[in-house]
Amino acid sequence: MIKQLFWRGLLLALVLVVLYQFWIFMHILWWVEHNPSSSAFMRASLSALQQDNPDAALKHQWVEYQRISIHLKRAVIAAEDAKFVGHEGFDWDGIQKAYEKNWKQGKIVAGGSTISQQLAKNLFLSTKRTPWRKLEEAVITWMLERMMSKRRIFEIYLNVIEWGNGVFGAEAAARHYYRTSASSLNVAQAARLAAMIPNPRYYDKHREARGLIRKARIIEARMRYAEVP
């Protein structure tokens, strides 16, 4: 009896996993041609903001790929994933370097995640670091890379990533920090925004942090070599 219940439970778990993957697959298929209105990360952020202020709202406005500054595209590629155009979702060299760096430090100080992996996490997953989440992130990344063009992946990424406390996407970020549009960002502004991506809420409050300024200068120097889809 116990053995029978075990196998039934296992079968049910497998069915639920398959259904969840199918649900993700259908969302990605829809987003090939349609723009996401929100993401898991955006919903979690809004929920946190509304705990303190029930009337809180996110700053977010979708903008088409061609209306995003080429400087911002180059800056983000240079900062987050220099091999984005060439890899298939995973930068194995980057992952190895991040692992070695984290091992030496004895804690997680580098992620090694590609733009595609970051998008997978932002669209569907929680911020908790668990083996299951990393496995699911890999599966979603694989789906994204095979169902979408690099340009589409990058367009969605630039429109849904967090750029400050309640600030999501390139258009909202450009208006929040520089009172301009995403299409009008110059080289220095783009480099500064790209430098903020790993810790946007902190840099929203510390916009003149030395680390941010130093990183922005490095990104600006690398932008000319960035390959954009």
Curated annotation (Swiss-Prot):
Keywords, comma-separated and alphabetical: Cell inner membrane, Cell membrane, Cell shape, Cell wall biogenesis/degradation, Glycosyltransferase, Membrane, Peptidoglycan synthesis, Transferase, Transmembrane, Transmembrane helix
Catalytic EC class: transferase
Catalytic activities: [GlcNAc-(1->4)-Mur2Ac(oyl-L-Ala-gamma-D-Glu-L-Lys-D-Ala-D-Ala)](n)-di-trans,octa-cis-undecaprenyl diphosphate + beta-D-GlcNAc-(1->4)-Mur2Ac(oyl-L-Ala-gamma-D-Glu-L-Lys-D-Ala-D-Ala)-di-trans,octa-cis-undecaprenyl diphosphate = [GlcNAc-(1->4)-Mur2Ac(oyl-L-Ala-gamma-D-Glu-L-Lys-D-Ala-D-Ala)](n+1)-di-trans,octa-cis-undecaprenyl diphosphate + di-trans,octa-cis-undecaprenyl diphosphate + H(+)
Bilayer disposition of the protein: Single-pass membrane protein
Transmembrane spans: 10-30
Subcellular location: Cell inner membrane
Cellular-component GO terms for this entry: peptidoglycan-based cell wall; plasma membrane
GO biological process: cell wall organization; peptidoglycan biosynthetic process; regulation of cell shape
EC number, as in UniProt: 2.4.99.28
GO molecular function term, any single one: peptidoglycan glycosyltransferase activity
Protein's pathway: Cell wall biogenesis; peptidoglycan biosynthesis
InterPro entries: Glyco_trans_51 (IPR001264), Lysozyme-like_dom_sf (IPR023346), PBP_transglycosylase (IPR036950), Pep_trsgly (IPR011812)
Chief subcellular location: membrane
Pfam short name (any one): Transgly
Stated role: Peptidoglycan polymerase that catalyzes glycan chain elongation from lipid-linked precursors.
Classification via HAMAP family: PGT_MtgA
Family of this protein: Belongs to the glycosyltransferase 51 family.
Protein's recorded name: Biosynthetic peptidoglycan transglycosylase
Organism from which the protein derives: Methylobacillus flagellatus (strain ATCC 51484 / DSM 6875 / VKM B-1610 / KT)
